[in-house]
């Protein structure tokens, strides 16, 4: 594949961002999307339209820039390497060095994949011992190997076909999760189950098994059992297949988890409390799996599908998260949750709920498995296409 060497400054304009004063409410609450690297944490889609925050015109003028549609957004610090494409005009904070593409030279979608495929190289341009950062000047000087526009478009088309399938499955999962949440909230509003439920402490229906501690040597392996860990818990609940590690150390039988088991995060690496207290159901992973010490397994005679919904959709997890403490890393003492009171419906209602929601959980797991497979296929293709080892006809 023939390529031309450019500096990034040759193929687009590198633009930083800014943060209007958060102390001034007059700057915020408009309709102009403003994102920070936090909005891209765990973000899987190629395109992004907005994050959690919005500016008004006064806020825009006070300290940031409006980037046009199709700008390639690149987080240049805390951390380096989040990438997305603006699907509409958008602002960023100072944690970005974004690229407004010269479309006569570079296809924005191709550049998105090029950056994804060359992150290790690009990260070398970061400076700073504690929090490495790529400066605007350094970003502009980074050299890239770019093929012709028709070849760029073909490569982008191949890779984006995988991402469209991934995003379609992701949308279906969101709909299924919303349906499950709606059913839970409709069925278990207190006034609807009054007289058919009992107030109990969690310790009356659950016991807790702590996961195992491990050394770096025990996960520095290419063969072993699955180690389900904190990265397998999605923010506010749900299971992530891509967080699994391999582990070749010892474990106790009670630390094994199987399909349908319920786990909870008892640590959080940030103060956001998105993970601590959150729960997930183990899908079918076809390999012996054990849990790490930052998780617990929740054991109960009550169906785990109901308990999962109770923790996640009944706000029990959010309540539990408030018991976690720590200056930098949050820790939750597992036994501290056992005295929390919950409302338990009678068995007939639980069984009826489970019969409706369990098939949704199974479908969510299947769609997540498809996403994992598509992601691995795309990630195998990406370096081969970018290097020219896999030739495409333009």
Question: Model segments located where?
Answer:
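Non-catalytic DNA-recognition/assembly elements of restriction-modification systems
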Residues: 1-18, 141-213, 343, 347-389, ...
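Sequence-specific dsDNA recognition surfaces
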Residues: 5-25, 38-69, 87, 92, ...
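Short amphipathic alpha-helical signal-transduction/dimerization elements
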Residues: 115-119, 123, 163, 315
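Structural signal for hydrophobic packing residues in well-ordered secondary-structure cores
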Residues: 103, 119, 123-126, 166, ...
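A short glycine-rich beta-alpha junction/loop motif
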Residues: 76, 90-98, 128-156, 287-294, ...
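Short coil/turn segments at secondary-structure boundaries
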Residues: 21-29, 127-128, 198, 215-223, ...
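A short beta-sheet element
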Residues: 36-38, 51-116, 229, 253-316, ...
């Amino acid at each position: 594949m023939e390529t031309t060497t450019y500096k990034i400054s040759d193929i687009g304009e590198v633009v930083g961002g800014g943060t209007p004063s958060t102390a001034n409410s007059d700057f915020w609450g408009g309709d102009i999307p403003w994102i920070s690297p936090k909005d891209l944490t765990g973000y899987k889609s190629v395109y992004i339209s907005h994050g959690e925050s919005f500016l008004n015109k006064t806020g825009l003028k006070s300290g940031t820039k409006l980037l046009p549609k199709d700008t390639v957004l690149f987080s240049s610090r805390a951390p380096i390497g989040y990438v997305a494409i603006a699907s509409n005009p958008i602002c960023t904070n100072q944690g970005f060095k974004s690229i407004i593409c010269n479309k006569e030279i570079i296809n924005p979608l191709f550049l998105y994949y090029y950056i994804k495929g060359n992150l290790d190289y690009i990260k070398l341009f970061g400076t700073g011992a504690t929090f490495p950062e790529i400066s605007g000047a350094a970003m502009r000087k980074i050299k890239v190997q770019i093929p012709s526009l028709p070849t760029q478009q073909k490569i982008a088309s191949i890779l984006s076909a995988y991402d469209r399938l991934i995003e379609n499955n992701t949308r279906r999962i969101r709909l299924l999760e919303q349906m499950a949440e709606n059913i839970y909230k409709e069925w278990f509003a207190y006034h609807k189950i009054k007289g058919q439920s009992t107030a109990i402490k969690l310790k009356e229906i659950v016991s807790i098994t702590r996961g195992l501690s491990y050394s770096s040597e025990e996960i520095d392996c290419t063969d072993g059992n699955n180690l389900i860990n904190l990265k397998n818990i999605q923010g506010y609940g749900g299971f992530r297949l891509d967080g699994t590690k391999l582990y070749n150390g010892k474990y106790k039988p009670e630390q094994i988890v199987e399909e349908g088991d319920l786990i909870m995060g008892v640590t959080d690496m940030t103060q956001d409390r998105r993970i601590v207290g959150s729960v997930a159901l183990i899908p079918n992973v076809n390999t012996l799996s054990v849990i790490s010490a930052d998780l617990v397994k929740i054991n109960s005679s009550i169906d785990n599908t109901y308990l999962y919904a109770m923790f996640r959709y009944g706000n029990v997890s959010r309540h539990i998260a408030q018991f976690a403490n720590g200056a930098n890393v949050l820790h939750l003492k597992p036994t501290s949750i056992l005295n929390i009171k919950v409302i338990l419906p009678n068995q007939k209602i639980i069984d009826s709920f489970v019969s409706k929601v369990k098939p949704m959980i199974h479908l969510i797991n299947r769609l997540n498995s498809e996403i994992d497979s598509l992601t691995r296929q795309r990630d195998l293709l990406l370096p081969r296409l970018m290097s020219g080892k896999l030739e495409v006809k333009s």
